[in-house]
């Protein structure tokens, strides 16, 4: 008989149900907090996991019913070393998906950890416990990925990486758009709202040969260039200084 098997981990639950638009199906406890439910049909339906703890029901969306947010072209270009828009594939991105059970919002996470045995994402959205948010490996690319329903912009997060010696280590996101102020080290989910207004400059650049033009790079450290300034204050002073000195680029 055609059916769909759903497995989920709810270690302390007294009972677990899988809820679809058609109703609830009770799951069977297999072992070690792993529960299994069998749904009729061949297509994976929109569903949620209902975990019962005493008199309390906890309703949540399953991260693993969503397709990977990193596509085949991303992994191919990344493996070739030719991916030129990595900030769109890796890091943390707020997303919303339609569903028969209602619109689902959350955050997709992706990180490159080619030598990891396993990777989990931890943060404010899961009590810093990655048990239910172990990330999926994207084949030989070394990329790990997961979509976490219910995660919100502004929440802190880190990646928890298992080394070959089986030890776990917490790491900040190298592709994060925002981070905590030191000495705290967590990354922060942040949506990009910047509107570029450099069409004229981009059009002018398109007509030039970058290999034939001059280049003079001004290398600087933001924190020590002129201490006490914000990013915007630095920008106001830096551009005029660089132009006056005759540099063409800033690092």
Region roles according to the model:
Residues 1, 24-108, 113, 138-219, ...:
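The feature marks proteins involved in alpha-glucan
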Residues 1-12, 17, 32:
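Ordered, small/hydrophobic-rich secondary-structure cores
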Residues 9-15, 112-119:
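Short proline/glycine-enriched turn/loop motifs at strand-loop junctions of beta-rich domains
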Residues 16-18, 119-121, 157:
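Short beta-strand elements bearing conserved aromatic residues within extracellular beta-rich modules
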Residues 19-21, 122-124, 162:
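Predominantly extracellular/luminal cell-surface or secreted proteins
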Residues 127-130:
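Short beta-strand and strand-turn-strand segments in soluble, beta-rich domains
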Residues 237-251:
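Catalytic domains of carbohydrate-active enzymes, especially glycoside hydrolases
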């Amino acid at each position: 008989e055609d059916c769909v098997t759903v497995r989920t981990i709810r270690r302390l639950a007294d009972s677990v149900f899988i809820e679809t638009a058609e109703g609830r199906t009770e799951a069977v406890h297999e072992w070690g907090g792993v529960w299994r439910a069998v749904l009729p049909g061949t297509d994976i339906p929109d569903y949620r996991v209902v975990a019962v703890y005493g008199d309390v029901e906890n309703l949540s969306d399953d991260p693993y019913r969503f397709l990977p947010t990193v596509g085949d072209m991303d992994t191919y270009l990344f493996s070739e070393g030719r991916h030129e828009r990595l900030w769109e594939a890796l890091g943390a991105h707020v997303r919303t998906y339609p569903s028969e059970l209602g619109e689902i919002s959350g955050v997709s996470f992706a990180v490159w950890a080619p030598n990891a045995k396993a990777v989990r994402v931890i943060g404010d959205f899961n009590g810093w416990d990655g048990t239910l948010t172990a990330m999926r490996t994207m084949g030989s690319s070394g990329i790990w990925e997961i979509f976490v329903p219910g995660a919100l912009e502004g929440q802190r997060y880190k990646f928890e990486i298992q080394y070959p010696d089986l030890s776990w280590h917490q790491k900040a996101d190298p592709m994060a758009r925002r981070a905590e102020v030191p000495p705290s080290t967590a990354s922060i989910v942040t949506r990009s709202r910047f509107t570029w207004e450099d069409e004229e400059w981009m059009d002018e650049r398109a007509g030039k040969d970058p290999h034939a033009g001059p280049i003079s790079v001004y290398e600087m450290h933001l924190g020590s260039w002129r201490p006490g300034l914000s990013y915007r204050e630095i920008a106001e002073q830096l551009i005029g200084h660089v132009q006056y000195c005759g540099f063409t680029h800033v690092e």
